[in-house]
Amino acid sequence: MAHKGLQLLGFTLSLLGLIGLIIGTIMPQWKMSAYVGDNIITAIAMYQGLWMSCAYQSTGQQQCKVYDSVLQLDSALQATRALMVVAILLTVAGLGVASMGMKCTNCGGDDKVKKSRIAMTGGIILSVGALCSIVACGWFTSQIIRDFYNPFTPVNTKYEFGAAIFIAWAGAFLDIMGGGMLASSCSKGQSSPNYPKSSRPVKSSRPPSSSKEYV
């Protein structure tokens, strides 16, 4: 049967991954202004996230602006936003399904094989959600690298990785590890017990004896 400790560990990792995905999606520090070349002015630090852009001054003041129109955003940012939202929703759904199939819960009936299969289904959903977040983070990362090394990009508009993208990466890997543990915890099922075949007496094919005993 499914190992209880493996299920608990997988569920915990996926839950931590969900927290990381939510924090990473909300934070505006997906990319930050890079101070390269002649761009050494550090009085203002620019950050851009999936939902807003912020400017931090050396005095401690902060100004953030939410993106007004979706149509003004580039395709990479729109795809990253959509994939991260889908990843969070799938992770929440996967945790709900997996919790019903875990051995330490009373949901999903008393059939242990059925419960382990439910836990496996939840693990698969979690893995799909993690893959969505990995694709989103990878896409955004490649966009930052491509713009940074593009010779036609002005120096004052070059960006490097922010803290949010690392948190999102960590959440994605925790999610996929937890989903893999839950998916691999399914048992193969119980085979029907093999009862010994009942041995029937072999009937004799000889005709009954016609001899009679005489006194």
Swiss-Prot record:
Residues 1-7, 103-117, 184-211 are cytoplasmic. Pfam families: PMP22_Claudin (PF00822). Keywords: Cell junction, Cell membrane, Membrane, Tight junction, Transmembrane, Transmembrane helix. Signal peptide: none annotated. It comes from the Eukaryota. Residues 196-215 have a biased composition (Low complexity). InterPro entries: Claudin, Claudin_CS, PMP22/EMP/MP20/Claudin. Residues 186-215 are annotated as: Disordered. The chain crosses the membrane at residues 8-28, 82-102, 118-138, 163-183. It is found in: Cell junction, Tight junction; Cell membrane. It is a multi-pass membrane protein. GO terms for molecular function: structural molecule activity. GO terms for biological process: adherens junction organization; bicellular tight junction assembly; cell adhesion; cilium assembly; epithelial cell-cell adhesion; establishment of epithelial cell apical/basal polarity; otolith development; pronephros development. Residues 29-81, 139-162 are extracellular. The keyword Mitochondrion does not apply. GO terms for cellular component: bicellular tight junction; plasma membrane. Residues 186-195 have a biased composition (Polar residues). Plays a major role in tight junction-specific obliteration of the intercellular space. Belongs to the claudin family. This is Claudin-7-B. It comes from Danio rerio. The lineage of its organism: Eukaryota, Metazoa, Chordata, Craniata, Vertebrata.
